[in-house]
């Protein structure tokens, strides 16, 4: 199977779109960062380093300090595909992030986005 082009895209090139999507719906950059931190384990400083280095998506997730074990609770459809059915691990992580940002932009409460019971 051919390598998907998003793997080689820099996280820094997509990050502003995540922030813009959230801010357009009245949410904040801090909330986007909180979601990314929850999913990947990057703290604010580490996240900024990844952005500054223009790390590609594949490396961004491969180097993630602590992928959250609760991320498997993320369910739903992104780009017409159920995230829980994506077999390729890196693509699944990317779509998890897309799904969380979508939920933020739709106004879902942060506790529900972060799968807190």
Q: Which residues are covered by each model-predicted region?
A:
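A charge-rich, low-complexity, intrinsically flexible signal that marks solvent-exposed coils, linkers
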Residues: 1-117
């Amino acid at each position: 199977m051919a390598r998907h082009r998003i793997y080689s895209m820099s996280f820094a090139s997509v990050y502003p779109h995540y922030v813009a999507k959230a801010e357009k719906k009245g949410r904040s950059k801090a909330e986007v960062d909180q979601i990314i931190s929850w999913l990947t384990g990057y703290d604010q400083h580490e996240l900024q380093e990844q952005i500054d280095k223009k790390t590609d998506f594949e490396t961004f997730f491969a180097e993630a300090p602590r992928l959250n074990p609760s991320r498997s609770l993320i369910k739903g459809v992104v780009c017409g595909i159920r995230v829980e059915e994506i077999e390729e691990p890196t693509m699944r992580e990317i779509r998890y992030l897309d799904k969380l940002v979508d939920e933020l932009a739709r106004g879902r409460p942060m506790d529900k986005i972060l799968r807190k019971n």
